[in-house]
A protein has these predicted regions:
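Active-site helix/loop module of the DD-peptidase/beta-lactamase fold
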Residues: 53, 57-58, 70-105, 118-146, ...
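Short glycine/serine- and small hydrophobic-enriched flexible loop segments
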Residues: 65-75, 112-117, 156-163
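Hydrophobic, well-ordered secondary-structure segments
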Residues: 108-112, 124, 128, 151
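Residue-level preference for non-acidic, small/hydrophobic
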Residues: 67, 98, 111, 131, ...
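A short, hydrophobic, proline-anchored segment that marks a local hinge/packing element in signaling
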Residues: 106, 114, 210-211
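Broad structural signal for hydrophobic residues in well-ordered alpha-helices, predominantly aliphatic
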Residues: 24, 114-115, 131
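Catalytic loop of the DD-peptidase/beta-lactamase superfamily, centered on the K-T-G motif
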Residues: 1-54, 119, 143-245
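A structural signal for well-ordered alpha-helical segments within the folded catalytic domains
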Residues: 60-65, 93, 109, 151-155
């Protein structure tokens, strides 16, 4: 017998899909997108899309989980200065500072150099061995100087982050990353992730991924052109409460 809560969840998922398709129909009908939960995708653009250029998501798909795995192994402490590990950095710079207060290529380069120094392996190999292969992200990898991944692999990654599984990333790392780490400073940040309305966390501008541990729900949007206001309207459609009838 179908429980009332199951019917409500199904109705909510259907409502989210209708809202998203309505938003994209006029703004970017060819955008690649999906929304789902820890059990997998609930709706999205056409299945079977080949790997896409997701280089802008490299920090969250490769660097952030690799750093998390090093923390779990106690090979890295977030508040220890990078110079203590033999890595060149400004005095007092820590991995925590780079993840929560710094943005852009310089911070990502410093963290990549740290991970590669601690392990003796390039980031591409670390991410594949520690994260992508364990999650079954067989289509994800670096090629032609950038990161490529099919939508199905993005769904696997985001769904895992909302699941109770402890491998390849620990719940502690995910939970600690999705809380404010900047105190009263603005803009507020977690560990790489940015807080957003409706209890969501996001990374990226074009493309963008979102997580809501509370719902639990994830979403991603890979637009065909700079999204402008579409990024906000897509998030609203995916995560704003469904109006009561």
């Amino acid at each position: 017998m179908t429980l009332q809560s199951d019917r409500a969840d199904a109705a909510d998922a259907a409502g989210v899909e209708v809202r998203i398709r309505g938003v994209l129909q006029g703004a970017d009908p060819d955008a690649v997108w999906a929304v789902g939960g820890p059990d997998g995708p609930h709706a999205g653009s056409a299945d079977g899309t080949p790997p896409l250029d997701v280089g802008a998501l490299m920090p969250v798909l490769a660097l952030w989980p690799v750093i998390g795995s090093l923390v779990a192994e106690e090979a890295l402490r977030l508040h220890t200065p990078l110079t203590a590990y033999g890595v060149e950095a400004a005095a007092g710079t820590t991995a925590h500072h780079l993840l929560s207060h710094s943005t852009g290529p310089a911070a990502h380069t410093s963290l990549t150099r740290l991970a590669e120094h601690l392990t003796g392996s390039p980031l591409a190999e670390l991410a594949a061995a520690r994260v992508w292969h364990p999650l079954g992200m067989t289509g994800t990898g670096f090629a032609d100087g950038t990161l490529h991944a099919p939508p199905a692999d993005l769904a696997r990654f985001l769904g895992y982050l909302l699941s109770p599984a402890e491998h390849p990333l620990t719940r502690a790392w995910i939970t600690e990353s999705l809380r404010i780490r900047t105190g009263e400073l603005t803009p507020a940040r977690g560990l790489l992730w940015h807080p957003a309305p409706y209890g969501t966390w996001s990374y990226g501008e074009t493309p963008t991924v979102w997580l809501s541990p509370r719902l639990p729900r994830w979403a991603f949007l890979l637009p065909t052109h700079p999204p402008g206001p579409l990024r906000t309207t897509f998030r609203e459609a995916a995560f704003a409460p469904t109006p009561s009838l």
